[in-house]
């Protein structure tokens, strides 16, 4: 199964080659496939902030490589690189404050610097750590795909119709994807007949990115207006909603793309199972509940500009990027460390316990 999944992988959004970071500019998809070459940390921070790269895991990976570029700059300057590098840690951390993976990756890079041996090549060590973060995320996604498909198999009566929202695919990760990884695996196993994708306003990650990823791999996908998703659940025989996560609190509350919360409410009303697929790096046990997760808001122009024209110029705008889905609306959280059905604080703590062997 794992070999089949790897062979089916066609989309990637992050490349590290000869000391340069290349990011597929997701703002331009699907009309243009343009790669950004990032040569310094300022360019990486801007790419994260401006959503050229997006998705919690992808942001963390890009930030890790950004620190490698930052260190290279600081060493060339010849000053106190350790003190100067703190500015770069801060600029990357502030780029997208909701993504738990971003802070996890930055903390892991900081920890690697603190474990340097006497005489060790600091730049080589940090680059190796960034590459390891990238590769481990892809491996985690492959594991989650297999675990998620076993859940779908357990409840399968016939080929199923799945609904996804936002973009939790290869573009949002180190490869293969989280929610879309499960969907890809289900299609390869003959268990997924059709995927419905919500358009995901206002950035249209569903229509621009998810539909593009699935269509590229020959997976039948139907795009739906966000306002049609409740009707879709009622009329089209949806069996699972499968989404990703940007941050998971200690009690199992999940911050994800704005609109996910109302999707979960509708799923419960219609008896549709709700699955969250995310690496354990998205879990922050320091956040007791979803109320503690910082939720980013973006510029009003994203809602007020249409085809270059300002609409409703006199109104105020509420434009949150994420919302929080309470744990009691979630049937299962799938991570590479294991599967949690009906998540709560005790189950999350057990999953993340350092004494676990797997």
Swiss-Prot record:
Sequence positions that bind substrate: 54-56, 96, 205, 256-257
Catalytic reaction annotation: 5-(methylsulfanyl)-alpha-D-ribose 1-phosphate = 5-(methylsulfanyl)-D-ribulose 1-phosphate
Annotated active site: 246 (proton donor)
Disulfide bond positions: none
Gene3D superfamilies hit by this protein: translation initiation factor eif-2b, domain 1, Translation initiation factor eif-2b, domain 2
Record key words, sorted: Amino-acid biosynthesis, Isomerase, Methionine biosynthesis
InterPro entries for the chain: IF-2B-related (IPR000649), IF-M1Pi (IPR005251), IF_2B-like_C (IPR042529), Initiation_fac_2B_a/b/d (IPR011559), M1Pi_N (IPR027363), NagB/RpiA_transferase-like (IPR037171)
GO biological process, one term: L-methionine salvage from methylthioadenosine
Any Pfam family hit: IF-2B
Enzyme class: isomerase
Pathway(s) per entry: Amino-acid biosynthesis; L-methionine biosynthesis via salvage pathway; L-methionine from S-methyl-5-thio-alpha-D-ribose 1-phosphate: step 1/6
Enzyme Commission code: 5.3.1.23
MF terms in GO: S-methyl-5-thioribose-1-phosphate isomerase activity
Protein family per UniProt: Belongs to the eIF-2B alpha/beta/delta subunits family. MtnA subfamily.
Its job: Catalyzes the interconversion of methylthioribose-1-phosphate (MTR-1-P) into methylthioribulose-1-phosphate (MTRu-1-P).
Name assigned to this protein: Methylthioribose-1-phosphate isomerase
Organism: Pseudomonas putida (strain W619)
Source lineage: Bacteria, Pseudomonadati, Pseudomonadota, Gammaproteobacteria, Pseudomonadales
Primary gene name: mtnA
């Amino acid at each position: 199964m794992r070999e089949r999944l790897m062979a089916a992988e066609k989309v990637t959004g992050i490349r590290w080659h000869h000391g340069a970071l290349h990011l597929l500019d997701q703002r331009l998809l699907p009309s243009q496939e343009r790669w950004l070459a990032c040569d310094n940390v300022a360019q990486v921070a801007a790419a994260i902030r401006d959503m050229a790269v997006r998705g919690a895991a992808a942001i963390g990976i890009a930030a890790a490589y950004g620190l490698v570029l930052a260190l290279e700059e600081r060493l060339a300057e010849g000053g106190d690189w350790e003190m100067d590098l703190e500015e770069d840690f801060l600029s990357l951390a502030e780029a997208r404050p909701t993504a738990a993976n971003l802070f996890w990756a930055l903390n892991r890079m900081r920890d690697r610097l603190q474990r340097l041996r006497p005489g060790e090549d600091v730049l080589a060590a940090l680059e190796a750590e960034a590459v390891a973060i990238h590769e481990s995320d892809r491996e985690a996604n492959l594991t989650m795909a297999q675990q998620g498909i076993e859940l779908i198999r357990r409840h399968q009566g016939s080929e199923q119709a799945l609904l996804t929202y936002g973009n939790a695919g290869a573009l949002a990760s180190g490869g293969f994807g989280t929610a879309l990884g499960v969907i890809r695996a289900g299609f390869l196993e003959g268990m997924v007949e059709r995927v419905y994708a919500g358009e995901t306003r206002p950035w249209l990650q569903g229509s621009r990115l998810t539909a593009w990823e699935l269509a590229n791999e020959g997976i039948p996908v139907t795009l739906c207006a966000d306002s049609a998703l409740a009707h879709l659940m009622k009329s089209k025989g949806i069996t699972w909603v499968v989404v990703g996560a940007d941050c998971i609190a200690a009690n199992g509350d999940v911050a994800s793309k704005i609109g996910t919360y109302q999707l979960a409410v509708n799923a419960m009303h219609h008896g549709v199972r709700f699955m969250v697929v995310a690496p354990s790096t998205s879990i922050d046990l320091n956040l007791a509940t979803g109320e503690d997760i910082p939720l980013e808001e973006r510029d009003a122009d994203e809602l007020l500009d249409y085809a270059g024209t300002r609409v409703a110029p006199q109104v105020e705008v509420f434009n949150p990027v994420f919302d929080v889905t309470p744990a009691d609306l979630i049937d299962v959280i799938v991570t590479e460390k294991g599967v949690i059905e009906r998540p709560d604080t005790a189950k999350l703590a057990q999953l993340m316990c350092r004494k676990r062997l797997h």
